[in-house]
């Protein structure tokens, strides 16, 4: 019993010592942690190809273990997001991606849970990469309104960030977002919304009635294809363009759960 008491006392003393020096310990560990983080390039680790990941798979209702809709796409050495639900950008960081490397965001539609993380996405990309041009947000008609709203809401913050961090880290010209809008395609039609370095991104219409516009995106790179549906009911147009592709990322929901929530 006496031996256990002595051990317990020693543990308490050691713990108190560590706690009292916690600031110095953190400062000593910080350079190594920063170096490890900066030296890791997730895109290079993945290699040249078409890579898809989920950075969020929840819905509009809060859930402790779910983040808002968000898909990571890596191709041609570039990093993209498809939809920007809450916490999606933070999950990308946990996945090892450099948030400053985000090339663009593709929006499938304008439900709140698919767009509510956009402000944070644009800010972390800007501050994390020292960009001097805004983040491109691709989407169907109406994306201009979304982007204008977020830019207005974050306008003062961009001034504060620039005043605090300076032009080298946060140039004012790189703050916010730029809308890249396309008409919703007719059924049977693909509209090219991005084409660079061998990567082609095409937009197609899906059925998310009564929400319109609502689109999916088809990614093609080096002979590989991935189709991300966004929110949709059963869609013959989506089925048509999904034939023969390598990967389909499709929405799923429980009608029983939805009915119970009404």
Predicted regions: what is each one?
Residues 2-226:
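Binuclear metal-dependent hydrolase catalytic cores
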Residues 210-213, 223-262:
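Active-site-proximal loop/helix segments of hydrolase catalytic cores
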